[in-house]
Amino acid sequence: DIDKSCNGLVELPAEEKHGILWVHPDPNGSFDLEAQLGELAAEFDSWGFEKYVFQGNTIFEHQMNWKLAIDTFGETYHFNTLHRDTLAKDFHGNCQMYDRFERNHRMMLCLKNIDNLRGQNAEECNVLHACLPVYYIWPNVQLIMGLNGPTLVRVYPEHANPNKSFSRISFFLAP
């Protein structure tokens, strides 16, 4: 048992589902997770997030509004120019798939390795060898599914300045 009166601890509405702990930031708030995720709920189940082990996290501070920080991850056309020595080596910068699920969306960033998979039976291929799925869960969460495990990005506004934000990035690996 924990004495919640110590250290300003406040109980928040939470639900553990799809291998993820979902928390509402308002102690008086509520949420309907299945309604929030919609069609993505079944897809999240298929990834088996519960099997991955937390490895640590890092925080990045941004000199931009949190909404801009979220939106700037929404395209890949700039990879070939701005990231030619890094991301452009692994990704086709002019190709991605985009699906919208109410307020959420999913992007599939096309890996150059997809070229090596042409002609193979799609049922025998691991989708993670062809692309990088990136989920945006409204309003501030990005979930990136990589070959080694998921990366969870949460972007928050800086309370004192709406022109600043920070990202808390958590890394998970298969045991």
Residue ranges and their predicted role:
Residues 12-16, 20-175:
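C-terminal catalytic domain of Rieske-type non-heme iron oxygenases
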Residues 1-13:
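Long, hydrophobic, well-ordered secondary-structure blocks that form the structural core
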